Amino acid sequence: MKLKKIIACAAAFAMTATCFAGCGSTSDSAADTSAETSAAAENDSAADTSEETSGEETSDSTDGEADPETRTIVDHTGAEVTLPANIDRVVISSILPLPSVYCLFRGSADDIIGIHPSSMAAAENSYLINVFPEIANADTSFVENGAVNIEQLLSMEPDVVFYSAANTEERDLYDNAGIPAVGFSTTMAGYDCIETYADWIELLGDIYGDSESADKIIEFGRNTASEIKAVTDNIADEDKPKVLILFNYANGVITAGGSDFFSKYWIETAGGINVAADLSGSAEINMEQVYEWDPDIILITNFSPYLPEDLYNNTIEGHDWSTVSAVNNGKVYKFPLGMYRWFPPCSDTPLVLKWLAKTIQPEKFADIDMDSEIKSYYKEFYGVELTDDDVQNIYTPA
């Protein structure tokens, strides 16, 4: 399947489209899940500090005159970071979904010289590497067994490293090595996925001095959230289905998404009731708990290898799903997989919210044509035209 490339006026979208690859492999999802949940456990006090200061730009000069060769920004930890005015060598470390957001904002992965191995695994099994094939050239060797090898990183000569603001020890490594490092938070927006996505874009706008591009992307996301909430805020609780997100389900272990996690935002904003709301973060559950909740809808993320058919056919050893309402009524769904897994914030976040609203409240959102929404978004923000087959492959990761 070939992508037809849109010839856009903006140079940001001047990239080569390639064949659409299968985007459903979850063989590396266990490592990714661990990193995602680790990043979601950030210190709230750091987030509070950054919320007040992030986005402020200061000069890097002792005499009050701006240095034209540097730019000083405030990251999501509240730290002032002095960066080169022209950034050509970027490493993206422990903030795993950020490569997709970076490519959305910059329109290219040309400046990315290194990414986390888990981010590379995700890219190779998603749409990202097809639209931005240059990301395949990024080096992953600076991370060994989940830890940063600072000597290897120094040999790559990065202008800046982007990392998860939760990882204070990682930040110490960069500071001690004299590498400019910018922390991106997953929690400062209270697990609001649209606002987290907006925070990341805004910080990239500060880093590159391009608030105009940032504002366009942020506006689209916030408008999407406003449109969905205008409907779901007026739905009575008795008209909201009970929803269970299986955040990670493999090897006999079921992990559900509770409160203080992205699942809360997704379910409640899209018009559902989170049956796991009494749990904190992502928590292990058993089938007895599932039977007690008896969810109307089950959503399986791409951090799990299972598909809806595995529950419908009751083929998962040791777990009997046959009596659960969502299974009996054919309402088990796998999250789609576009530029990144559609659960944590990523470059496709506005589409995730529309898909969830359509899935959880189909009658209320009958006017949403997801095929058209996906094609329009990819054309406007990535500069590619998707075929019907491309869209179906996003919906049905293997």
Residue spans for each PLM region:
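Structural recognition of the beta-strand scaffold that forms the well-ordered cores
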Residues: R89-S93, D111-H116, V160-S164, A181-S185, ...
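Bacterial Sec-exported substrate-binding components of ABC uptake systems
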Residues: I6, G24-V101, E212-L246, A366-A398
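Extracytoplasmic substrate-binding proteins
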Residues: E170-G252, A276-A277, V327-P397
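Bacterial Sec-dependent N-terminal signal peptides
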Residues: M1-A10
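Proline-aspartate-enriched helix->loop->beta-strand connector
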Residues: T140-N145, I150-Y163, M287-F303
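Alpha-helical, coiled-coil/dimerization segments enriched in small aliphatic residues
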Residues: T255-G281
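A short, structured surface patch at a secondary-structure boundary
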Residues: S94-Q152, V160
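C-terminal motif of bacterial Sec signal peptides marking the signal peptidase cleavage site
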Residues: T18-G22
